[in-house]
Each structure stands twice: as C-alpha cells, then as structure tokens.
Amino acid sequence: MIRPLEAIGCLWLVWLAGWMLAALTAAKSVVRQSGTGRLVHGLLVAAGAILVLGRHSWLGPLLRQVYPAKAWIGWTGVVLCAAGLAFAVWARVQIGRFWSGTVALKAEHALIRGGPYAITRHPIYSGLLLALVGTAITRDSRAAFLGLPVVFAGLYVKLKQEERLLLERFGPEYEKYRAEVPALIPRL
C-alpha cells in the first residue's frame, strides 16, 4: 500500500510535469520583471521548498519530528496537498495564455476575475501554499515547517511586484478588484 510521503511525491511529480507542459502554451511577454526581482523571490521560494521537501542530512536536528507519527496525520497532509495543487491548476487553466512563471504582462493582457480569481487575486500562490502546508504536515519535520514562512516570503515578494505591474496596466479596474477580492486567503 502507498504511504503518505509516497503519495505526496507522486502528487508533486504529476503537478510539475503538467505545469511544465502547460508553460508551452503561454503567450509572449511584452513587459517582464527585472532579473534582480526574479532572483530575490526565486531564492526565497527555492530555499523554502528545499526545507519543506528535502530530507538532506545537513539539516541535522531540523529533521526531527514535530509530533508523534500517525497515519491519519500524514493522509490529512496528502488531502491538503492535493486540494492545493488542484486549486493552483484550476487557476492556471483559468488564466490561460496570460500565465507566466515570472512577473510579466502579455500582449493584449486581460484582467481575469472569474473562477478561482473571484475567490483570491493570486490563487496559484494560494494553492501552492496550501499544498506546501499539506506537504509539511506529511513530512513532519522542523525543517518542513520552517520552510513554509520562507516560501511565503518569496511568494509575497513576487505578489507585490505583480500587484504594482497590474495596477500600472489596469489602473482603477485593478483597484476595484483589489478592494473586492483578497490577495491570498479567502475572506481575509
């Protein structure tokens, strides 16, 4: 029978393969963030992801468990991870050709407000954060839980860069959207 950690690994591998294939459908960017901006959020997200996903020996005491191992706890994390990845995929499908792995605007870029974008302005980040919380619960290590705020910081840096760019491009329309829809967590 498959164990929770194996299920988590499968979820992330399937998501990554699909995400890479979907990237081939993105339109060409006409405005793109600076290399420095990409570097800052990229390093934070990568460092946090290594802590959440990794089991490297150099992490030493950070690999200690946080709570007693129970199968139901691991499977709860798997469910959260699957839900988060599904939400991120739904958002990626909804944004379609306007998606970019970097902070960018596409030719004829439209402000997407439907589907998951009616729930949160950055549903891909929301979904990925939920998936990482689920992964940390399943991994059950201090390193995994310490990695979560590091990933959040990286995504927050990118979110702020995107917000500035979208505000410049869409002006009052984006201001209205910002007033109506939360950035990451619904109802907050």
Report the location of each language-model feature.
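Solvent-exposed interhelical
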Residues: H109-T120, I124-Y125, L167
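Membrane-anchoring alpha-helices and their flanking helix-loop junctions
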Residues: M1-K106, R113, A131-L188
